[in-house]
Amino acid sequence: MTTVLKNKYAETGFPNDPILLDPKMIVRTDVEAVKVVVDACLKPEKSPLIKSNLAENIGIHSLWFKDERNRMNMGSFKAIGATYVLAREASEKVGLNASEDDLKKSLKGRTYVTASAGNHGLSLANGARLFGAKAIIYLSKTVPTEFAEFIKTYGADVVVAGENYEASMAAAAEAATQNNWTLLSDSTWENYSAGVDVMAGYLIMASEAFEECPVTPTHIFLQAGIGGFPASVAAFARRYYGNEPKIIIVEPTEAPVIQASISAGKAVEVKGEVSIMGRLDCKVPSLAALSSLASTANYCMTITDQEST
């Protein structure tokens, strides 16, 4: 059943939130700094903002969606996420004005590992391929075999471990420690903040969408897994538009971790069956993302698997 929660912490955030005391856990909105690296090292074409014909059918003024399917030929809305982080590390090593050949081998010898429900792992695999690094992607047993094979086409190694995303992340973190690899998750937790920089890559998408949209949106709907993507876009929306648009976070009914956490006033783990919305089927939130969404989101809602098809 669909549920809707009004966020009582909107505009103020969780009271006495310890996450706000750590500067590394603050969600970034500095898209200008991100663009410098992306334009120099990745040079992606803009993705289109499309006006949907559904608006007339449902009786609203207009409905717009950002189509990321062809971004960097990846078919992923997180194409510029982990790839941005690796581009930044490459530019720090060889310089923003380095040749394409120098960039291609700039991270040679480095191994990055992560767990993913899909999109983030693909972005890391692509970034490693572009800059000469090695990527190892941990996937849970619920991720389709076809997607695992697709990630391998980017040169990454794939390890299937755990019954869900959280178990595969634990396995990836353990492997990173044992092998001295770099763990690059798009999530954040206590004493781990690298996901904040991954989230910064999503600012490119948000910036493009807001600049292209001819009207100020009244409502912005953002899908959530662990919360990194919507937290980044919502934070930038508040910088760009202020408090005018209503921001709604959308999750599967089987994994309403942002809704449940905001309802509880703190991060909680949720239980549920496996959702067919596999890339959103996450039961534990990113702490930095949740902290930010507590102040930037107005509502949380869920949709059922049946409604999503």
Tell me what each language-model feature is.
Residues 1-309:
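PLP-dependent amino-acid enzyme catalytic core
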